[in-house]
């Protein structure tokens, strides 16, 4: 704990949801949509051009305080304009981001920021300027005593140590982080992200929801117009799973429809009338876009297992075995039943085929050692990034690597361009 004796605050701002809470806890205290509802007043063009926090907005008027975040933002969508301050993992509107953090700290966590160190997360390849903007808001607006900005992939690796599959605490591995808006495949070696090998996949939870909705509409399922997206999302989260073979799965449904088809029961939010939605092939076709993306999009056609294999193959050769041996899942869109099992099988097939071909081409002169492929699933997978941050921020070393307010005052925001890796975490 800090000198005040209070735990650090951990906030993970995702594209779809923000997770926040105090270090040392196993789950975030609050999980809210990363959305803000404002009166739609035009943003100062100087802010928009520089994507900078507005220091001249320090003297707030009533309009500056008239906003809602999270679920309350959607509840007030008829009167207020909803915007997403984070898109594809990156902060797009720093004015709204500052307002969002303000409510997170004072309304939800109900803490005095001057008394708590803060751990915030960032996506891979985040621009150093973004760290400066974050530091400026945290140190100047909220006057926090200490700040650490952690890479989400490293935190996800740390969270995987809770899995029974993990026999060795290591910060070397491949993180597949799939949330609501974006999916990243991130190789990490000894706590450092191999930036040149990161792969981005334009498919994530929101795309699965839209695909499920598309399939329901094609079958003319009667869903209240105002609730179509929410119903598709609930069907995805309740009934979807990953199948081992899509052709065999179709046959199962056609042979035994009573066994495999499900029914979603809902109540209209306006008329309060009950309604039913039949759920069929959507159960396995939704998550299947990760493994056969051509069924959903003609723009991106590379299956996730192939992307993971290509990512690891592009890394330095001495790191590859460690990256194959520790493939860690993170994010809500990796929570589908048998997701890890299917992914491990497909990656293993690709690796074994390459070894077999190399032996054939060398006419048996080269004998390769088998590569161990292991995909790690664990019970903290959905909140892996936040939980990893909670673990690290509860260690004494966290306070040693934090950038302090005193250092910020002496050096300026550039001090937060670099955040040291926790060296003693794996001990």
Swiss-Prot record:
GO terms for cellular component: actin cytoskeleton; cell projection; cytoplasm. Pfam families: Actin. It comes from the Eukaryota. GO terms for molecular function: actin binding; ATP binding. Functions as ATP-binding component of the Arp2/3 complex which is involved in regulation of actin polymerization and together with an activating nucleation-promoting factor (NPF) mediates the formation of branched actin networks. Seems to contact the pointed end of the daughter actin filament. Component of the Arp2/3 complex composed of ARP2, ARP3, ARPC1B/p41-ARC, ARPC2/p34-ARC, ARPC3/p21-ARC, ARPC4/p20-ARC and ARPC5/p16-ARC. Belongs to the actin family. ARP3 subfamily. This is Actin-related protein 3. It comes from Acanthamoeba castellanii. The lineage of its organism: Eukaryota, Amoebozoa, Discosea, Longamoebia, Centramoebida. The gene is ARP3.
């Amino acid at each position: 704990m800090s000198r005040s004796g209070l735990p650090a605050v951990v906030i993970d701002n995702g594209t779809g949801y923000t997770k926040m809470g105090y270090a040392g806890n196993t789950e975030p205290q609050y999980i809210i949509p990363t959305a803000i509802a404002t009166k739609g007043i035009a943003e100062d063009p100087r802010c928009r051009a520089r994507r900078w926090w507005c220091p001249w907005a320090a003297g707030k008027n009533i309009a500056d305080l008239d906003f809602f975040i999270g679920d309350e933002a959607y509840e007030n969508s008829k009167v207020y304009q909803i915007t997403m301050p984070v898109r594809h993992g990156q902060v797009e509107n720093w004015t709204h981001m500052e307002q969002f953090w303000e409510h997170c700290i004072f309304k939800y966590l109900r803490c005095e920021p001057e008394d708590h160190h803060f751990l915030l997360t960032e996506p891979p390849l985040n621009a150093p300027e973004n760290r400066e903007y974050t530091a400026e808001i945290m140190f100047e607006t909220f006057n926090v005593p200490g700040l650490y900005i952690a890479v989400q992939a490293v935190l996800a690796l740390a969270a995987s140590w809770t899995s029974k599959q993990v026999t060795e605490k290591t910060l070397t591995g491949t993180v597949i982080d799939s949330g609501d808006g974006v999916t990243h495949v991130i190789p990490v070696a000894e706590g450092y992200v191999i930036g040149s090998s990161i792969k981005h996949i334009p498919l994530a939870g929101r795309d699965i929801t839209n695909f499920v909705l598309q399939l329901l509409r094609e079958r003319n399922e009667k869903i209240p117009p105002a609730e179509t997206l929410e119903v598709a999302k609930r069907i995805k989260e309740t009934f979807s799973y990953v199948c081992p073979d899509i052709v065999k799965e179709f046959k199962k449904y056609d042979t035994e429809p009573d066994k495999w088809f499900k029914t979603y029961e809902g109540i209209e939010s306006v008329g309060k009338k009950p309604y039913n939605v039949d759920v069929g092939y959507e159960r396995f076709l939704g998550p299947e876009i990760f493994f056969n993306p051509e069924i959903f999009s003609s723009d991106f056609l590379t299956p996730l297992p192939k992307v993971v294999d290509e990512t690891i193959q592009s890394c330095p050769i001495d790191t590859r075995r460690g990256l194959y041996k520790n493939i860690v899942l993170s994010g809500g869109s990796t929570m589908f039943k048998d997701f890890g099992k299917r992914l491990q099988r497909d990656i293993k097939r690709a690796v074994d085929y390459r070894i077999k071909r190399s032996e054939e081409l060398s006419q048996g002169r080269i004998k390769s050692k088998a590569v161990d492929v292991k995909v790690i699933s664990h019970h903290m997978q959905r909140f892996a990034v936040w939980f990893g941050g909670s673990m690290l921020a509860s260690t004494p070393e966290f306070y040693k690597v934090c950038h302090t307010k005193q250092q910020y005052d002496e050096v300026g925001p550039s001090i937060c361009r670099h955040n040291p890796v926790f060296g003693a975490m794996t001990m």
